[in-house]
Design a protein with these regions (language model features):
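Residue-identity detector for glutamine
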Residues: 30, 34-35, 43, 134, ...
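Acidic-enriched, low-complexity/disordered segments with a strong bias for Aspartate over Glutamate
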Residues: 20-22, 26, 82-83, 90, ...
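Functional beta-strand-loop-alpha-helix junction segments that form "active/interaction loops"
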Residues: 1-37
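Bimodal feature
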Residues: 10, 14, 84-96, 154-157, ...
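Catalytic cores of nucleophile-dependent amide-cleaving enzymes
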Residues: 36-119
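Context-gated lysine
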Residues: 4-9, 23, 38-39, 68, ...
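Caspase-like cysteine protease fold
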Residues: 124-170
Length: 170
């Protein structure tokens, strides 16, 4: 699926619809998407994984090194930081510690898309402040609080610092 912005700066989204995991259709679709991107010399700046966490391995194996932002919006995305950073060492990662859910993923994606369409830099502090205001109480707040923005993602920050330090010692 290809989605194009109709207003503001051009934003293109390439997505794979949920397909039968047991028949391997999702992997086939991912392979076709990779071929399409390569054929058209497209290098995604953002990679988003949504859906069940048992698919995240396939997403990470196909992660384009050009990804500057990686969103792991499935359950327990936080546990995949090291794998993401092996391919995209400078990526800004949003990940869920526990349950990933559409009611949180969609506002995050909309906030990022809105910034890009307006030609703005993605600045996490104001984005996260606005998102926090959307989930002031209840279950939605609890679920939102399980998402870790890049500037608070201590696991990713530690891995990046460790990798840099080890590289400087060689």
């Amino acid at each position: 699926v290809e989605i194009k912005s109709t207003k503001g700066k051009p934003v293109f989204i390439y997505a794979i619809l949920p397909l039968d995991y047991e028949k391997g259709l999702d992997s086939i679709a991912q392979m076709h998407l990779q071929q399409y991107l390569k054929k058209h010399n497209l290098q995604p700046g953002i990679t988003i994984h949504r859906g069940h966490s048992y698919w995240v391995g396939s997403t990470i194996r196909n992660l384009p090194p050009s990804s500057k932002i990686v969103i792991l919006g499935s359950c327990g995305g936080f546990h995949n930081l090291d794998d993401v950073l092996k391919t995209c060492p400078d990526a800004h990662i949003i990940s869920s510690k526990e349950v990933g859910t559409r009611i949180i993923n969609e506002p995050i994606l909309k906030a990022i898309n809105d910034e890009l369409k307006e030609g703005k830099d993605v600045e996490w502090l104001p984005i996260w402040k606005d998102l926090t205001a959307q989930f002031p109480t209840g279950d939605a707040k609890e679920r939102f609080d399980n998402y870790i923005p890049p500037y608070k993602n201590l696991g990713a920050l530690f891995i990046k610092a460790y990798t840099r330090q080890m590289g400087s010692m060689e």
